[in-house]
Amino acid sequence: CAITEVGAARFRGGECLGTLQTMVDPGCGIPSSITVLTGITESMVAGAPSIREVLPSLEEFIGDAVLVGHNVRFDLSFLREAARLAGRAPLTNRSVDTCALARRLLHDELPNCRLGTIARHLRLDHQPRHRALDDVLATADLLHLLIERAGALGASGLDDLLGLPSMAGHP
């Protein structure tokens, strides 16, 4: 159907500078499969702002920061479509996909690259629950761990990760 929740966090040097979280009224019924996966019900989004109303505050919160996500292109495709429908410019921020990075750095340790599998295996502080902010915080934990692991490839921070072959991305 459409976006039902937005979550974001800003980090600098591993420190969380702030978070943004809101339910979003998708303007249509929520399929039962989404409710089973996320726990989000129609009553939870009743009265919530539309994505059209949320986009300006999300864009302001994000600014020109690098966007990090697990399968980030999937999430960005929803935001890009929402921006198009709202008559807004799409996000043009650089992006890093922790799924692609995990495949490269953890490929021999894990049966798959699902965020939940990785979070359990690595005992991340935050566990993903298919809820926006939980997944954001788990992804941030994963990124920080992967930055440490990427040191063997000569990367010492996010800017270096963007320069690694097959790690750089643009929405």
Over which residues does each language-model region extend?
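Acidic two-metal-ion nuclease catalytic site recognized across multiple nuclease folds
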Residues: 121, 140-171
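Short, solvent-exposed coil/turn elements at secondary-structure transition points
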Residues: 14, 25, 101-104, 164-167
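Conserved non-catalytic scaffold segment of RNase H-like nuclease domains
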Residues: 1-93, 108-130
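A charged, well-structured terminal subsegment
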Residues: 126-145
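Conserved beta-strand -> loop -> alpha-helix junction used to position metal-binding or nucleic-acid-contacting
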Residues: 89-103
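Short Asp/Glu-rich motifs
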Residues: 54, 102, 138-139
